[in-house]
Design a protein with these regions (language model features):
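Short, charged/polar "capping" segments at the starts of alpha-helices
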Residues: 19-20, 45-50, 115-119
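Walker A (P-loop) phosphate-binding motif
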Residues: 145-189
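Glycine/threonine-rich flexible loop motifs
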Residues: 86-93
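Extreme N-terminal, non-catalytic leader segments
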Residues: 97-157
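Short internal beta-strands
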Residues: 35-43, 109-111
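ATP-dependent carboxylate-amine ligase catalytic core
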Residues: 2-8, 22, 27-30, 41, ...
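Redox-cofactor binding/interface segments in oxidoreductases and associated redox assembly factors
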Residues: 77-84, 110
Length: 201
């Protein structure tokens, strides 16, 4: 899959911007190609992502209106949900934020188990505003399972596995790719999870 064109993101992490719950936000910040305009999280408003992730100057704001008009920064065009609430469900408190983002013309990118495109209110608002909803958990129409096809000669595949989520499988794969490219080898990262797809899909 060819990477999408770079976007200008505001990342929603309300109440969860930290190493345990914001793996999507942190992964996109550390490895993504998109410009990140702001972190939308009222619990850390006024602070900066570089307190947690040195070298990443991204202000945290309390409201979407603030994120849309930060002096010296471009207007975002996409709201990306950067944390996974318990069960991967959409918190009711976020509904207004998402609807406001749609009305402001922002695309929505989500890895939640709740598919935003199947929510009647959110889907109708997006259709009326002419904006896209991208549910990264939505399975493609045709998904090929294991077919026993062998790899091409000379190709090496490194599979990273773990016994839990958010323990670094994707980060290891991305660091291996970075090291391989630095050594002059050809290497690609094939994402299978939502965060990886947001970074490289």
């Amino acid at each position: 899959m060819e990477p999408t064109a770079p976007r200008r993101l505001v990342i929603l992490t309300e109440g969860g911007f930290g190493p345990h719950h914001a793996k999507t936000a942190w992964g996109v910040i550390r490895y993504g190609r998109d410009e990140i305009v702001a972190i939308l999280d009222s619990t850390i408003a006024g602070r900066n992502a570089n307190e947690w992730l040195p070298g990443h100057d991204i202000p945290a704001v309390a409201t979407l209106d603030e994120a849309l008009a930060i002096p010296g920064r471009p207007r975002p065009d996409t709201l990306l949900i950067g944390i996974a609430p318990t069960g991967g469900l959409l918190p009711n408190a976020w509904r207004t934020i998402l609807l406001d983002a749609i009305r402001a013309g922002l695309e929505l990118h989500s890895g939640l188990h709740t598919l935003l495109g199947d929510d009647p209110e959110i889907a109708a608002a997006a259709a009326a505003a002419g904006v896209r909803i991208v549910d990264h958990r939505r399975a493609p129409d045709r998904m090929e399972c294991a077919v026993g096809r062998r790899h091409l000669p000379g190709r090496r595949v490194i599979l990273t596995v773990g016994t839990d989520c958010a323990i670094g499988k994707m980060s290891v794969a991305l660091e291996l790719r970075r090291a391989a490219l630095a050594a002059g080898d050809r290497a690609v990262f094939v994402p299978s999870g939502q965060t990886g797809m947001m970074i490289d899909g």
